[in-house]
């Protein structure tokens, strides 16, 4: 079994598309098939999406829920961390060595928690 895709909820699709579009710009993920309710970014082996909730209720971030991205290097961790903050994300943990991995933590504008690790 392997991870196929991950979807984060949003209450503002325009802000999410701007945030993730810029964040993923150099990552190999390509934006495809945007609709009024959901926008996907794809790579050969993975998909990520931002979506307005199907039930029409307000999107909320999960307490204890986090999306982790393996990005290949400490430099890329730091670049993505800084980019996320420039795009309106907030810091949840500055780039540093944590155990065997160099990582950083941010929240997107909807407060979904993301981790970037080398």
Where are these regions (language model features)?
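Absolute protein N-terminus
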Residues: 1-3, 118
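Vicinal oxygen chelate
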Residues: 3-11, 27, 59-118
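Residue-level marker for the onset of beta-strands and adjacent loop->beta junctions
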Residues: 4, 35-37, 91, 102
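Core segments of cupin and vicinal oxygen chelate
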Residues: 7-48
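Short secondary-structure boundary/capping segments
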Residues: 40, 56-59
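Conserved, structured core segments of small domains
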Residues: 48-54
